[in-house]
From Swiss-Prot:
It holds the Pfam family Mitovir_RNA_pol. Keywords: Host mitochondrion, Nucleotidyltransferase, Ribonucleoprotein, RNA-binding, RNA-directed RNA polymerase, Transferase, Viral RNA replication. GO terms for molecular function: RNA binding; RNA-directed RNA polymerase activity. Forms a ribonucleoprotein complex with the viral RNA. Since the viral RNA is not encapsidated, ribonucleoprotein complex formation appears to be the strategy to survive in the host as persistent virus. Its EC number is 2.7.7.48. It is found in: Host mitochondrion. GO terms for cellular component: host cell mitochondrion; ribonucleoprotein complex. The lineage of its organism: Viruses, Riboviria, Orthornavirae, Lenarviricota, Howeltoviricetes. It is an enzyme of class 2 (transferase). It comes from the Viruses. This is RNA-directed RNA polymerase. It catalyses: RNA(n) + a ribonucleoside 5'-triphosphate = RNA(n+1) + diphosphate. RNA-directed RNA polymerase that replicates the viral (+) and (-) genome.
């Protein structure tokens, strides 16, 4: 796995210069993309295959540090733009139609956008947002064949097919005919195109007023928790074991804190803020000791030491009119789809105390097959695989303000069951601090703040427990598995359990929007995608994603997403997409080839053939790659050593003399506290890691220089690594980065020997062999690649993969 040189000083410089307007250049930003090498295993051929190949692609390409922001003065859209204008509607539609290959309906889709433009001009973007949002909801329910519930806020006229009238009849007719013939999957590309175009409402420039009522409104349910016996049974069914204590991990964030622009650098003021709510000092001690034992006591003593040292200077500063530090504040994030999310920014010391708990709960979620936190696709695939009833309905429920309204008392009981020392009450007390907001200081009345460590993780874990309790109430005695969860998103494939789930949620005071919930035997909505049986997988891109890809090389990220989901076939890639690209892209043939090779390898080799224990297109390159690789490695080592030294010098000269706090403490006070501040040790730790990484890289260079015969380099690992580079995300208008990328690819082409124009034949080769089992190929002459042995299922090596005798002719 690649590691990046740790350089916190660059962000330190950026924030310091932003506040004090200091002139001068930034410190050198070292971003060596290296691999940590275990020197004891360097002679092990199998162990070094992936290590050396990571080195080839990371060092030669060096693309991970590429920014996708456009700094030019062109009229093209910037990547960080979130809102659309009417002038961009037609281009958006044409791009979506091109990606989904629905050119026969392009005129119909242009009519939709024409009507949207008219509504914008006459009623404004706010009304258009509400209208398209309702059109989207009604369209999804109509495709799912659910009874339509008209909204009371906005009226949308329906046509004879019971689709919104804004959708032209030819599109409706095609979808309905396939639905009646029970082949709705045949309209997959058409539905994707339709929903993507309707999803343009998510990026309309709307004016949203933040709603704080979900935070301060009193509890409206019947009970704030569930019976302890049921909770213990549910947690036992989830195979969660009790924990005595956790290992404390010190962390620091470079994001904004409640008292400064960089949370890591304001730990002294964050410690001082505890005097505004003195009872939280003892609550912090209680939580730390219960979770971390003696190390928790040391953490509390560390915080108290800083508090007591800064207290005299703080009192003087407050008397002179300085701002009083705060424990936390509420920030508003204006998200897409007309949402204003209220995010809590809490104390850095509280975040440090919660960090290990945060990691532990996420570890528990990773072991639950029905959770989609780490893989959004997997839980629904397992649900379809394990589902026995072919006509079973999918209950996709939409929760309203789940984080704010899910009772924290229930989460406290779950924490007390998981941990032997019962830290739940002190955890709740630390989350219920007073948060500064435009409406004054607020405290969460029912739920917990979104944005604090452990917040989302506890929401997801509690959601799993609620489903298991609903299954127990339905008569299940074993673990219930016919569901999937992603945070507050849930799909249940059982009638009785779904009914009990609704009762539980009503008891707990959570509201479920029936109008937004998708309940159907055809498909449902999960993780912003429509999913169902028979590989029915409808995903719709937002405007921001489409325009983002339009600036990137060839839109191939979007195209390969369509490929991966079965919307189009691999053999259509060149005739339907690449050959129809504008002429401006012809100059990037080598980029095209590498993007195609990387993604097709990921699709074909990554999924189906590997499932059969076969590894295609795998050969070892010879020793001729070693000299150029050594030169590249040595150049990178020298560059990163210089960058690391420049960063250290900048830190010593300027890094610790600029205040980052907002409450008015004198700069010399912070300088006096440097030896005991967490930020000092975190920065030193990062520099030590950087030094260690570079030392290991130099050791690898030395061993490769004098023991090159111990290495075997597999081409498959190179191509696998290419799927993680930034080539598909490259902004083609950034000429410097395009030129640098092309130069690196030419170097890599000399090593890997994939000539320009060979990607089409590469696809044909993979597709031809990927359909055969066992695979038998006598000879493949194209592109100078020769197969020495037939591809069979005999002679398996390293975890069931066939080592093929490929080599460069």
């Amino acid at each position: 796995m690649a590691m990046i040189i740790h350089d916190p000083v660059y962000k330190l410089w950026y924030a310091x210069r932003a506040k004090s307007n200091l002139p001068g250049l930034a410190p050198h930003k070292t971003e060596s993309i290296t691999t940590v090498l275990s020197l004891t295993n360097v002679k092990n051929k199998q162990a070094t295959n992936s290590i050396l190949l990571n080195k080839i692609t990371d060092l030669v390409l060096g693309l991970k540090a590429f920014s996708i922001k456009s700094k030019g003065v062109r009229t093209t859209l910037r990547v960080n733009k979130h809102w659309i204008t009417p002038k961009e509607f037609p281009r958006f539609v044409k791009l979506v139609v091109w990606c989904t290959r629905t050119q026969e309906h392009e005129d119909s889709f242009m009519k939709i956008i024409g009507k949207c433009d008219h509504i914008w001009q006459t009623a404004g973007p706010n009304f258009l947002f509400k209208y398209l949002k309702e059109v989207m909801r009604l369209s999804v329910r109509r495709i799912a064949n659910i009874e339509l519930e008209p909204s009371k806020k906005i009226f949308v006229k329906l046509n004879k097919f019971r689709f919104p009238n804004i959708i032209p009849l030819p599109i409706c007719d095609q979808i309905i005919r396939d639905q009646n013939d029970q082949v709705l999957w045949a309209s997959k590309r058409l539905i994707i195109c339709l929903l993507t175009i309707l999803s343009v409402h998510r990026v309309l420039p709307t004016k949203v007023v933040p709603d704080y009522s979900t935070i301060v409104d009193p509890f409206t349910g019947v009970s704030k928790t569930i019976d302890q016996k049921l909770l213990r049974k549910a947690i036992h069914l989830l195979n969660i074991k009790r924990v005595k204590q956790l290992k404390l991990k010190i962390t620091g964030s470079m994001k904004a804190g409640p008292n400064g622009k960089i949370s890591l650098l304001t730990s002294s003021v964050d410690a001082l803020s505890f005097i505004t709510q003195p009872t939280k000092i003892f609550t912090y001690l209680d939580f730390s000791v219960r979770v971390y034992k003696f190390r928790g006591l040391l953490l509390w003593m560390w915080m108290m030491c800083i508090l007591l040292i800064t207290l005299p200077y703080a009192i003087v500063s407050f008397m002179l009119g300085a701002l009083i530090p705060i424990m936390g504040k509420l920030s508003v994030v204006y998200d897409q789809a007309g949402k204003a999310r209220i995010v809590a920014i809490t104390n850095s010391w509280i975040q440090t105390a919660f960090y290990s708990l945060h990691l532990h709960v996420f570890k528990l979620l990773k072991n639950i097959d029905q959770d989609g936190t780490f893989d959004q696709e997997r839980p629904f695939k397992l649900l379809i695989k394990w589902l026995n009833e072919p006509t079973q309905k999918f209950y996709g429920f939409d929760l309203t303000a789940a984080t704010d309204r899910l009772p924290i008392d229930l989460q406290v009981d779950i924490l007390n069951i998981i941990f032997k020392n019962s830290p739940g009450s002190s955890w709740r007390s630390l989350l219920r601090i007073k948060y500064k907001s435009p409406q004054g200081f607020l405290t969460y009345a029912v739920g917990q703040p979104m944005g604090a460590y452990s917040s989302f993780a506890m929401l997801a874990l509690t959601h799993h427990v609620i489903v298991q309790v609903a299954a127990l109430n339905s008569g299940f005695t074993t673990r219930f598995t016919d569901y999937c969860i992603l945070g507050d998103d849930i799909v249940i494939a059982h009638d009785t359990v779904a009914s009990e789930y609704l009762k539980l949620m009503e008891t707990l005071g959570l509201s479920i929007s029936s109008g937004k919930s998708v309940i159907s035997s055809e498909f449902t909505e999960f993780a912003k995608k429509l999913k169902g049986r028979n590989n029915f997988d409808i995903f719709y891109r937002s405007w921001f994603s489409i325009i983002h890809f339009e600036k990137q090389i060839l839109h191939l990220c979007t195209v390969f997403e369509l490929l991966r989901r079965g919307v189009c076939e691999l053999y259509d890639l060149y005739p339907q997409y690449i050959n129809k690209l504008p002429k401006i892209y012809l100059r990037y043939n080598l980029l095209i080839d590498w993007v195609v090779v990387a993604f097709t390898n990921q699709i074909l080799i990554g999924d189906r053939p590997r499932a059969d224990g076969i590894r295609l297109f795998d050969y070892f390159v010879g020793l001729e790659v070693i000299p150029p690789l050594l030169r590249i490695m040595l150049h990178t080592i020298k560059k990163d050593w210089n960058g690391l030294w420049n960063s250290i010098k900048y830190t010593l000269n300027k890094g610790f003399v600029v205040s980052q706090v907002r409450v008015g403490l004198p700069d010399w006070t912070e300088l006096f506290l440097l030896p005991i501040l967490p930020s000092t040790y975190i920065i030193i730790r990062d520099y030590c890691r950087s030094f260690n990484d570079l030392t290991k890289l130099f050791g690898e260079w030395w061993l490769l220089r004098f023991e090159s015969e111990s290495y075997q380099v597999s081409i498959l690992d190179v191509i696998d690594r290419l799927a993680h580079t930034s080539i598909p995300n490259l902004d083609i208008h950034d000429k410097k980065k395009v030129k640098l990328t092309l130069d690196n690819l030419y170097k890599l082409s000399l090593i890997v020997n994939i000539p320009s124009g060979g990607a089409r034949r590469y696809i044909e080769f993979l597709r031809f062999n990927g359909l055969k089992s066992p695979l038998i190929v006598e000879r493949y002459i194209k592109d100078g690649i020769r197969i020495e042995k037939p591809l069979t299922l005999q002679g398996l090596h390293r975890s069931g993969d066939i080592q093929l005798g490929f080599k460069i002719s």
